[in-house]
């Protein structure tokens, strides 16, 4: 099975599907507690258009290794140190650097489309802004940077409680169960997601959340994301949200990469994983937008299907 390591302490599981000669490659990045299979509703669609598709389980998730984090790490250690086997962190910037190294290993040097969900968007936008020579389009799904500092500071109890690690998974399960699913979401989806979250190692989950939004400098906070990404997202950008609030940061605070091509789409009523439950509508937006930005050939009006 394919694994890749930038930091020797992490073996990252990935799949490389589609033609190696494809003109464009899609990198799929998941959110907190998720795995590559969360994109199973999109992969067949992407492959049907002869795109190369790279799916990866990031640090601590899915089939990738999840070594015990160093509790002394309270800020991102940086590019070089995050590759050191003695440095075990779970910041999204480290995840992004892992993915960039993997793409280089696979010989992917241009025409990359990044699609990321929720916490994965911190890594996705990092990749898009760090490597504008590589990324030609960015697609964000319910970006985590919708949350402002005011909300993050209100929730510091999640990290400051003396029993924080013991409480973090039950707290997240309660939060996700309450706020991330609508009455229209089927029971099987909610059951699957929350049972999967319950399987996590508590120390790894704590480290993922700390790196994602607990650290006052983390990219999962609106103000930090705007500071890090505003004006640096040069590629066309499609932002899809489960409600208007989730797309607000991109709409109101992050300048467009391309005035003519950037879009915001809201698909309401199907929760945080709407790309699973409304996959035909979601994939339809991807197809239309890919045609708009030139990734797929445009279909002339009235052309036979």
Please place each PLM-identified region on the residue numbering.
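Gly/Ala-rich beta-loop-alpha elbow adjacent to hydrolase catalytic centers
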Residues: 116-120, 124
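Short beta-strand immediately N-terminal to the catalytic nucleophile in serine-hydrolase-like folds
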Residues: 114-116, 141
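Conserved serine/cysteine hydrolase catalytic core
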Residues: 202-258, 263-266, 299
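Catalytic active-site module of serine/aspartate enzymes centered on a nucleophile-bearing elbow/loop
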Residues: 260-305
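Conserved acidic catalytic loop of the alpha/beta-hydrolase fold
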Residues: 93-112
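Conserved HGGG/HGGXW glycine-rich cap/lid loop of the alpha/beta-hydrolase fold
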Residues: 8-81
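Flexible "cap/lid" loop of the alpha/beta hydrolase fold
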Residues: 125-130, 134-168
């Amino acid at each position: 099975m394919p694994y890749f390591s930038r930091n020797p302490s992490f073996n990252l599981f990935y799949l490389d599907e589609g033609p190696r000669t494809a003109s464009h490659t899609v990198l799929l990045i998941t959110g907190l507690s998720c795995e590559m299979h969360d994109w199973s509703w999109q992969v067949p669609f992407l492959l049907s258009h002869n795109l190369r598709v790279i799916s990866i389980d990031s640090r601590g998730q899915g089939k990738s290794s999840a070594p015990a984090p160093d509790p002394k790490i309270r800020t991102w250690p940086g590019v070089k140190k995050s590759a050191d086997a003695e440095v075990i962190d779970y910041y999204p910037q480290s995840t992004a650097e892992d993915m960039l190294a993997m793409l280089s290993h696979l010989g992917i040097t241009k025409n990359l489309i990044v699609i990321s969900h929720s916490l994965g968007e911190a890594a996705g936008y990092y990749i898009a802004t760090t490597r504008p020579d590589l990324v030609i389009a960015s697609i964000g799904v319910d970006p985590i940077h919708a949350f402002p500092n005011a909300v993050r500071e209100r929730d510091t109890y999640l990290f400051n409680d003396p029993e924080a690690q013991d409480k973090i998974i039950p707290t997240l399960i309660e939060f996700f169960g309450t706020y991330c699913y609508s009455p229209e979401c089927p029971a099987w989806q909610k059951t699957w997601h929350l049972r999967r979250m319950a399987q996590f190692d508590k120390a790894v989950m704590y480290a993922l959340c700390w790196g994602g939004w607990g650290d006052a400098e983390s990219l999962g906070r609106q103000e930090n994301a705007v500071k890090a990404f505003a004006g640096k997202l040069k590629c066309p950008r499609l932002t899809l949200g489960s409600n208007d609030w989730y797309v607000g940061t991109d709409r109101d605070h992050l300048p467009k990469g391309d005035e003519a091509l950037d879009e915001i789409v809201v698909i309401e009523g199907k929760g945080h994983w709407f790309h699973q439950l409304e996959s035909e509508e979601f994939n339809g937006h991807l197809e239309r937008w890919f045609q708009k930005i030139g990734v797929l050939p445009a279909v002339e009006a009235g052309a036979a299907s």
